Amino acid sequence: MSGSYTPAPGGPFSALTPSMWPQDILAKYCQKDPGTEVELQYDEFGFRIDSEDGVETRKWLCGDGAPQREDPQQRLRWQAHLEFTHNHTVGDLTWDKITPTLARSDRLRSLVLGGIPHSMRPQLWMRLSGALQKKRTSDISYREIVKNSSNDDTTAAKQIEKDLLRTMPTNACFNTLTSVGVPKLRRVLRGLAWLYPDIGYCQGTGMVVSCLLLFLEEEDALWMMCALIEDLLPPSYFSSTLLGVQTDQRVLRQLIVQYLPRLDKLLQEHDIELSLITLHWFLTAFASVVDIRILLRIWDLLFYEGSMVLFQVTLGMLKIKEDELVSSENSASIFNTLSDLPSQLEDGAAVLGEAVRLAGSLSQENLDTHRHKHLAYILAEQAQLNSNNSHSLNTNLNKVVRRQNMRRKSTLSSLLWGEDEVEALKAKNIKQTELVAALREAINRTAEHFHCLDPRNCSTDLTPDYSMESHQRDHENFLVVSRNRRRRAKALLDFERHDDDELGFRKNDIITIISQKDEHCWVGELNGLRGWFPAKFVEILDERSKEYSLAGDDTVTEAVNDLVRGSLCPALKAIFQHGLKKPSILGGPCHPWLFIEEAASKEVERDFNSVYSRLVLCKTYRLDEDGKVLTPEELLYRAVQSVNMSHDTAHVQMDVKFRSLICVGLNEQVLHLWLEVLCSSMSAVEKWYHPWSFLRSPGWVQIKCELRVLSKFAFSLSQDCELPTKKEEKEQRPLKEGVQDMLVKHHLFSWDIDG
């Protein structure tokens, strides 16, 4: 490359793939001025060398163990093997002449155990793992994956952004946002989260990907991860449940009983839970756990033999330190020794040698038997804790399914010649299945959020009711007014109790309102105590047909906002966009919000005058804001108008309006009824959607049943949280207007605390 710098052989960054060479740092190394010194020193892999261990590191680099200092005899043995098995014609053997997969043999395994020459690792890893075969036979290209995932504004994408600089902070390729590896890491992780929607993003994948990127191009790194996820590791290794890696921890514990009985006795005597340490080893495939030079030797074997290597290496590491562990005096010493064990290893060949010597007899058949047994135990335990999630648990046991992508004709060819009907119909059916699966996943994740944070929701049934009677009950339930007449409020800040007739509370406490006779001072009850408090210090809760939950309040629990606006709303928008008619080339905009506006208006215009008068009554006199007056149609119309009024002044996009409307529907517990209202507006639906769309087909009924599950949870989401905050509306402490009046009344009047 013109104007680029190349690392010195054996020097800093010399073991990295050329695209990862940090040019800004190499430029400093290549400066001719002998008086100029680089502030930080880096090793051949780009890791920062600390001053206290710099001498030891340089000694290691000068030894025979450095990967770039290849043994000529070792390289010749690999070349001879490849020539013998692949070169059947006269001429030089090149990588493009070698098949995508290498035939397994004792000779090949022996070569892998002896180590792969570092310069040959990128090509051999791709072939040993099967990643190259996946890359060449995939229906979707890496470019398409990046394009599709770049617009995937999900919770996973936000979490990836937070973790980019945490993944490998001591490596020059990943320690700042401008580092050469960070954009690559972002694209690969977002691509994996899009490619495997059932998995999403797991922090363990970030560790593995960052290490792969040091030696492979980003496209190859993605396909290596596909091989790991689909073939080399069991299902659900990186899923939200971590069932696969949890199972392997129990299998490891049983193997220790068999192979390391002295260590097993020690762990039992001191009641040490080994998985607290080793789960991270397995989840990251030892990336960021052991020294990078040892990791390369482990991965050589892992990509050839699969997950069995994780057990063999762990057993070998424990065997090396067994005597030291057994001689430990107490539990703390044992735990610390186990935690520090990987960082104390220096010889990769010794680790692999001990692993093969001790656990070389371990077979894949034995491993699978152990896994099936312990997986059954885990599922039985989790089923007892939450029988309602048995469906999601069983789903996680299935083989990991990659998202499919149907290649479409260009817009011009579609206009001129149309689409192949059979292919188009197949693509639409597959797309509909994916849309429902994505929505169901978003709903289940939201429900699990409530299960984890609010114990009252643990017994909530998440199974959609598809019966005909359920639709009749929807409207009956909507018309039933809650008999719970108590009013409650949430504390906006702390209020300290000074007198016996005052009610003290902390921010976010839930207070039962006893009296609101006075404008400034209310009487309430909390934890069996009654007293007065400033009305401005609390906010009335919206609990018409529900009981307030902190898990659904985005001012208290920020995660619920990410789940709804970052996961549920995109899934719903995809359904509303499916089959939406595109405008002509010179036509206007096309967005689900425009359809919602029109359908909502059409449903209320039949009796517009009476509806308008009721809306005015509700707004002016607060008459029946709990649904006794307003029907679902009227609530939808009112919500659309409210969103437009608040959002138009901020000039936000229609995507934001759509997400805000979904939040209102969740607050009102009528999201499923609103879908029915919209799909029942046939004139608007036929105008905006193709016949094969969800909203014009009977498929919308299934979507309604899925959404009904969310009506079982109490949401308190802000409609305007995505709007820019005005300066004059910045948060203020509610201690200004009216507080003087409240204090005067407190001293001049006696309060009837008992109401």
Curated annotation (Swiss-Prot):
CDD domains recorded for this chain?
Answer: RUN_SGSM3, SH3_SGSM3
The RUN domain sits at 559-722
Protein's UniProt keywords contain Coiled coil? yes
| Coiled-coil regions listed | 419-445
Query: Which Gene3D superfamilies does the UniProt entry name for this protein?
Result: 1.20.58.900, putative rabgap domain of human tbc1 domain family member 14 like domains (1.10.8.270), SH3 Domains (2.30.30.40), Ypt/Rab-GAP domain of gyp1p, domain 3 (1.10.472.80)
Where's the Rab-GAP TBC domain?
115-306
What region holds the SH3 domain? 484-543
Instruction: Extract one GO molecular function annotation from the record.
Output: GTPase activator activity
In terms of SUPFAM superfamilies, this protein maps to: RUN domain-like, SH3-domain, Ypt/Rab-GAP domain of gyp1p
Which keywords does UniProt give here? Coiled coil, SH3 domain
Q: Of which family is this protein a member?
A: Belongs to the small G protein signaling modulator family.
Q: What is this protein called?
A: Small G protein signaling modulator 3
* Organism of derivation: Danio rerio (Zebrafish)
